[in-house]
């Protein structure tokens, strides 16, 4: 068992750098920022309690696994069996930054914002398993292996689910799968 100061230091090194991504994943899974913040707070408590069990590997994948599991526990406790997502997605910070950097004029910024909102809505409209795979890979940047370990499925299943999810996303956005 780690002393509390050692545990706090490890928590700061392993968990804190990934809190933004943790909030993003929780937001995608819960559908809103307030619930996501609750999930991340609970995840931080769980991560701190389990910090001595971290055995190496990707800290990001470890943290996001805790967030994912906490999210499912939270949803089972606080949500009805059928989950309705709001049509007011708060956005993904990373996508907003990319859109903001590329937009030099007010007109370009409006177009970028509209495009970002369209993509966010399309992701929210994906079935849960598809949305989860897309968020973990394309937004949080986890490797196929990290996703496979997190979801306890073979890498091939990750790849096929991601391909299907991307095809659904392309269809939702009105682009051919070859263009996506």
PLM feature segments, named:
Residues 32, 143, 152-157:
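Helix-turn-helix DNA-binding motif, specifically the short coil turn and the N-cap/start of the second
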Residues 2-5, 9-11, 83-84, 93, ...:
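C-terminal edge and immediately downstream basic/flexible tail or linker adjoining helix-turn-helix-like DNA-binding
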Residues 133-137:
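A short pre-motif secondary-structure segment
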Residues 38-45, 49, 57-69:
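Structural recognition of an alpha-helix C-terminal capping motif at a helix-to-coil junction
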Residues 14, 18, 22, 43, ...:
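Residue-level preference for hydrophobic side chains embedded in well-ordered alpha helices
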Residues 1-24, 34-37:
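A short, charge-rich alpha-helical start-of-domain segment used by transcription regulators
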Residues 13, 118-126:
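Short amphipathic alpha-helical boundary/capping segments
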Residues 65-87, 112:
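Arg/Lys-rich amphipathic alpha helix in sigma70-family domain 2
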């Amino acid at each position: 068992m780690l002393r509390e100061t050692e545990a706090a230091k490890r928590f700061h090194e392993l968990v804190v750098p990934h809190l933004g991504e943790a909030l993003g994943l929780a937001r995608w899974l819960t559908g809103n920022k307030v619930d996501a913040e609750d999930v991340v707070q609970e995840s931080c408590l769980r991560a701190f309690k389990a910090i001595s069990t971290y055995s190496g590997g990707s800290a990001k994948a470890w943290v996001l696994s805790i967030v994912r599991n906490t999210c499912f526990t939270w949803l089972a406790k606080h949500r009805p069996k059928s989950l309705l997502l709001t049509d007011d997605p708060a956005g993904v910070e990373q996508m907003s930054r990319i859109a903001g950097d590329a937009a030099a004029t007010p007109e370009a910024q409006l177009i970028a914002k509209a495009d970002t909102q369209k993509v966010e809505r399309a992701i929210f409209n994906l079935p849960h398993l598809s949305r989860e795979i897309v968020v973990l890979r394309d937004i949080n940047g986890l490797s196929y292996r990290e996703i496979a370990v997190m979801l306890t499925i073979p890498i091939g299943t990750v790849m096929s689910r991601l391909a299907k999810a991307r095809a659904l996303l392309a269809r939702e956005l009105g682009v051919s799968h070859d263009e996506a």
